[in-house]
UniProtKB/Swiss-Prot annotation:
GO terms for biological process: carboxylic acid metabolic process; coenzyme A biosynthetic process; methanofuran biosynthetic process. Keywords: Decarboxylase, Lyase, Pyridoxal phosphate. It catalyses: L-tyrosine + H(+) = tyramine + CO2; L-aspartate + H(+) = beta-alanine + CO2. InterPro entries: GrpII_AminoAcid_Decarb, MfnA, PyrdxlP-dep_de-COase, PyrdxlP-dep_Trfase, PyrdxlP-dep_Trfase_major, PyrdxlP-dep_Trfase_small. This is Probable L-tyrosine/L-aspartate decarboxylase. It comes from Methanothermobacter thermautotrophicus (strain ATCC 29096 / DSM 1053 / JCM 10044 / NBRC 100330 / Delta H).
Length: 363
């Protein structure tokens, strides 16, 4: 199965742009972990961080291109832990947070505390407030949750973290490459980026809605002091300090991401965002017409729904038999469809036809 088949419906990744693939292949023999040998790739990485910083309201942001959201979230938690210096460090994450935070807690020796969600599946701010203690080194908010595409109330989290002097990390691995462009088209979506003074770091993945090849993730910090807090000496390399988790990093991701961002421009990404939201609305409307039950109204390009009489796992099995690759969310249990750029409206019409057939057979 391929992305271009239009039948992969549960993935947050997509077909990379042909230009990005060509550039990636041209830079296979490069190593950002030893940038003195490959100076051009370091400049391209800096260019990407600069463009993302502009997009996310902090032109002077510092950061790196890395493998993806898991590594970015790990780096953010490491920076927060190192800067806080707590003896028994804790992090507070929403129950909707990505599983990578459990990995980070395990690797870094952090106690992970989960905040409750409200009725709309966004983090409950009062639950976060109650969990804060003298050991809290970071609070996490999500801009585009993995299962439902919800945007946490980051503005309120920012105020809390400013008052408490706590690192606020925003996991925008999914939302970071669509929310800003939808806002530019007039969509009423909440602020989540460095414009909010309490935000310390942001994860964003160009290999999701950015059309960059896998692996192309990014971590951005408000300033370079967060990188300094993770820096170690690398005496035998051309660069004598390193703050990333991974030592050997391909320069191909930096080059390909730089190329596709320059090629698309903000206007190109705005058009892409509007297109996927149009496909999202078509699926949403078709499901309602067929009497499927929406979990929530889509905020981004993710639709979660249930059959009125059939469990989501059984429905997923039926769809798989018909050639569709969907995923099942856990909070709450539902069929989850991510409307990535490889999914066109004609694919959704075929899906709705199959969903109608399933409904008719159950009546």
């Amino acid at each position: 199965m391929t992305y271009t088949s239009g039948r992969i419906l549960g993935s947050m990744c997509t077909s990379s742009h042909p230009l990005a693939r060509r550039v990636y292949c041209d830079f296979l023999e490069s190593n950002l972990g030893d940038p003195g040998l490959f100076r051009g790739t370091r400049e391209l990485e800096s260019g990407v961080i600069g463009m993302l910083g502009e997009l996310l309201s902090e032109p002077d942001a510092a950061g790196h291109i890395i493998t993806g959201g898991t590594e970015a979230n790990l780096m953010a938690m490491r920076a927060a832990r190192n800067m806080a210096g707590a003896e028994k460090p804790e992090i507070i994450v929403p129950k909707s947070a990505h599983f990578s935070f459990r990995k980070a807690a395990d690797i870094l020796g952090l106690r992970l505390r989960e905040a409750e969600l409200d009725q709309d599946y966004r983090v409950d701010v009062e639950s976060v407030r109650k969990l804060i203690s003298e050991n809290t080194v970071a609070v996490v908010g999500v801009a585009g949750t993995t299962e439902l595409g919800r945007i946490d109330p980051v503005e309120e989290l920012s105020e809390i973290c400013l008052d408490e002097d706590i690192h606020l990390h925003i996991d925008a691995a999914f939302g970071g490459f669509i929310i800003p462009f939808l806002r530019e088209t007039g969509a009423e979506l909440p602020e989540f980026d460095f414009k909010l003074q309490g935000v310390s770091s942001i994860t964003v993945d160009p290999h999701k809605m950015g059309l960059a090849p896998i692996p192309s993730g990014c971590i951005l910090f408000r300033d370079a002091s967060y990188l300094d807090a993770m820096s170690i000496e690398t005496p035998y390399l051309t660069e004598k300090q390193q703050s990333t988790i991974v030592g050997t990093r391909t320069g191909a991701s930096a080059a390909a991401t730089w190329a596709i961002m320059k090629h698309m421009g903000r206007e190109g990404y705005r058009k892409l965002a509007l297109r996927v939201m149009g496909v999202t609305r078509r699926l949403r409307d078709g499901l309602v017409e067929l009497d499927y039950q929406l979990v929530v109204e889509p905020e981004l390009n993710i639709v979660a729904f249930n059959h009125p009489a059939m469990g989501p796992h059984e429905l997923a099995d039926r769809l798989e038999e018909l050639g569709w690759a969907v995923s099942v969310s856990s909070c709450p249990p539902a069929i989850r469809v991510v409307l990535m750029p490889h999914i066109m409206e004609e694919h959704i019409e075929l899906l709705l036809r199959d969903l109608e057939g399933i409904r008719l057979r159950e009546e």
